Structures are given as structure tokens and as C-alpha cells.
Regions:
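Signature of N-terminal electron-transfer/Fe-S-associated modules in redox systems
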Residues: 1-174
Length: 174
């Protein structure tokens, strides 16, 4: 057994004792009832299970939860898809996903949404040139698998959020 303490979507959890072999995906879904994080491939290849990990230095990245033990997240601060909206108010990225019909079955949506959010946060700190935007989005979403082939729609949704707030996310033209 492992004693686990962590923060999820701004709320502290723990100490809670979990089996050493319990995956983070199972912890979220079975222990906490947070079913937005999906179990896709079970090999960290499709990234439908990706959550956001917030480091103390202010950087964030996504991490798969299907192969990672819950214990490996001890002491960490993470965000799941359930943590994006504030009450009934969706984020700009969530609204863009809906407007673009970026999901069909929705299985991969949480991973794409989390990756898109990390990209937005990164660009807010280090904007890119407009000419580099398409490649920047493609690189960020690379590795996420959509069984329904919604890649273009996810890409377009992320791009629209960035362009709608270009002063925040894009470098000033030289």
C-alpha cells in the first residue's frame, strides 16, 4: 500500500491509502468518480487518458494516466477535464471544441482538451509568430489519437482560440 497526497483541480486529496499497482486512471475513475479521463489503449499511446500536471515552477505538461501508478502522482498538482469549466461556464477552448464539432464519440476529447490548454498556457508565456502557429498546434496535438478522425476539427478549434486572443498568444509582428 502507498499513502497518497495530491491536489486535483485545486482540491487536496489525502492521505489516502492505495494499492501500489493502482493506476492513476483507475484512481481518478474508481476512487474519485472523475470519469472524464478515459482509458483508451492502456499503453500510453493514444493519450485519451492525459491529465495536466502543474509543476511548482509554473510550468505544466500532460501526462498519461493509464500506465502510471497513482503513487507516481504523490505530492503533485494535477488538472483533469472536470477542472476546466468554472461551474456552468465553459472555457473558450471548450466552447471552440463544441463550435467546431471537434468530437464525435468524445473518447479522446479530454486528452485533446488538456493538451490544448497546456499549449495556450505556454503561448501566453512565450508567444509564437503567426507563421509558426499551424506547426506549433500540430506539434502540441501530435501523439493524440482520435478514432473518429477529428484531428482537423481539434486543430481548428485550438487555432480559433489563439487567433481570437492573438495579442496574448501570438508574437507581435516585426
Amino acid at each position: 500500500m502507498t499513502r497518497l497526497n495530491l491536489t486535483i483541480n485545486g482540491r487536496s486529496y489525502g492521505p489516502v491509502d492505495v494499492r501500489d499497482e493502482l493506476s492513476m486512471n483507475d484512481f481518478l475513475r474508481e476512487y474519485l468518480g472523475m470519469t472524464g479521463t478515459k482509458f483508451g489503449c492502456g499503453a500510453a499511446q493514444c493519450l485519451s487518458c492525459a491529465v495536466i500536471v502543474d509543476d511548482p515552477d509554473g510550468t505544466s505538461y500532460t501526462s498519461p494516466t493509464c500506465v502510471a501508478s497513482a503513487a507516481s502522482f504523490d505530492g503533485k498538482s494535477i488538472r483533469t477535464v472536470e477542472g476546466h469549466a468554472k461551474g456552468d461556464e465553459l472555457t473558450a477552448l471548450q466552447k471552440a471544441f463544441i463550435q467546431h464539432f471537434a468530437f464525435q464519440c468524445g473518447y479522446c476529447t479530454a486528452g485533446f482538451l488538456n493538451e490544448g490548454q497546456v499549449l495556450l498556457e505556454r503561448l501566453a508565456k512565450a508567444p509564437v509568430k503567426r507563421a509558426d502557429l499551424e506547426n506549433t498546434i500540430a506539434e502540441a496535438l501530435d501523439g493524440h489519437i482520435c478514432r473518429c478522425t477529428g484531428y482537423v476539427k481539434y486543430h481548428e478549434a485550438v487555432r480559433d482560440v489563439i487567433l481570437a486572443d492573438s495579442k496574448r498568444y501570438l508574437a507581435a509582428s516585426q
